[in-house]
Design a protein with these regions (language model features):
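Catalytic, metal-anchored helix/loop core of enzyme active sites in primary metabolism
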Residues: 49-51, 57-122
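Substrate-binding/catalytic subdomain of NAD(P)-dependent oxidoreductase enzymes
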Residues: 1-75, 80-82
């Protein structure tokens, strides 16, 4: 939720406090849900999702989601994080890097997102 707060502020000029983002953790993922995902060629990933709607509102949430194994986010593992962007000015773009653990941060990935956002808004 913390990273999503930062990304939404940058991309949509909208601040939402992390505690106000609907969040579902991974504790509800059962063995059966994992097996069902595998049977459907999917991987369960904890996804922070935000989307600007046609009416200007922004919908957002953090929750486990089934990602088709062909989707680039399905291959992100361990301490790595990724930001997958769909935009009008760019096709699908993914930024990837270490973003968890005591030393690595998502600053490099975030820096790339900021640079692209600045160029898209020119």
């Amino acid at each position: 939720a913390n990273k999503l707060t930062i990304l939404m502020a940058l991309m949509f000029d909208k601040y939402v406090a992390p505690q106000d983002i609907p969040t579902t953790g991974i504790t509800q993922i059962t063995k059966e849900k994992i097996e069902e995902a595998r049977a459907n060629n999917c991987t369960i990933k904890l996804i922070a999702h935000a989307k600007k709607l046609e009416n200007g509102e922004v919908e957002y949430e953090v929750k486990p989601m089934n990602m088709d194994n062909s989707h680039p986010l399905a291959s992100i593992n361990k301490e790595f994080n990724a930001v997958f962007v769909k935009g009008n000015a760019v096709d699908d773009v993914m930024f990837y890097g270490k973003g968890a653990g005591p030393l690595p941060t998502g600053s490099a990935v975030l820096g790339d997102v900021i640079d692209i956002a600045k160029n898209v808004m020119k």
